[in-house]
Regions:
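PLP-dependent enzyme catalytic core of the Aspartate aminotransferase-like
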Residues: 66, 70-128
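Short aromatic/hydrophobic-glycine micro-motifs
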Residues: 20, 57-58, 101
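General beta-strand structural signal in soluble alpha/beta enzymes
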Residues: 24, 60-62
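General structural feature for long, well-ordered alpha-helical segments within catalytic domains
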Residues: 3-11, 31, 44, 48, ...
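Conserved PLP-dependent catalytic core of the aminotransferase class-I/II
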Residues: 1-23, 51
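Conserved PLP-binding catalytic core of the aspartate aminotransferase-like
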Residues: 21-55
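A common structural junction motif
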Residues: 52-60, 94-96
């Protein structure tokens, strides 16, 4: 398993930009493999999960146990790159828009882009 803490922080930046919460209440509890996004009270997070999958082909995890229906999970581990994470975040934004979640469209993707470009080292090209 490849854990990507930098990708995780980009996802957390998106969650903050959406005005939603992280299920982990302290940063010391944040995971480098998955972020559980807390939706507004009374809203069923499973609606977002279903819309993301059926409308955009994006697979999100469901909340389990006490957080069932209260969170959706975004994974950020394995063979990923920044565009793949941004694509997933875009799919989440589309699904949230479909479900009537109140947020500024593009805010999460934009926050992740800012995070990734602020910390990225340029790739060395073979021709250089």
């Amino acid at each position: 398993m490849i854990m990507r803490p930098d990708f995780a922080e980009g996802v957390r930046a998106a969650v903050r930009a959406w005005g939603l919460g992280n299920c982990a209440r302290r940063s010391s509890l944040y995971s480098d493999t998955v972020t559980a996004v807390v939706v507004e009270p009374g809203f069923d997070a499973n609606r977002i999960i279903q819309a993301a999958y059926h409308n955009y082909g994006v697979s999100l995890g469901a909340g389990l146990g006490k957080v069932a229906g209260k969170v959706f999970r975004i994974g950020h581990l394995g063979w990923l790159n920044e565009p793949m994470v941004l694509q997933a975040l875009g799919g989440v934004e589309l699904a949230m828009r479909d479900c009537g979640v109140n947020f500024t469209a593009g805010s999460g993707v934009g926050a992740a882009i800012e995070h990734y470009t602020d910390r990225r080292e340029p790739l060395a090209l073979a021709a250089e």
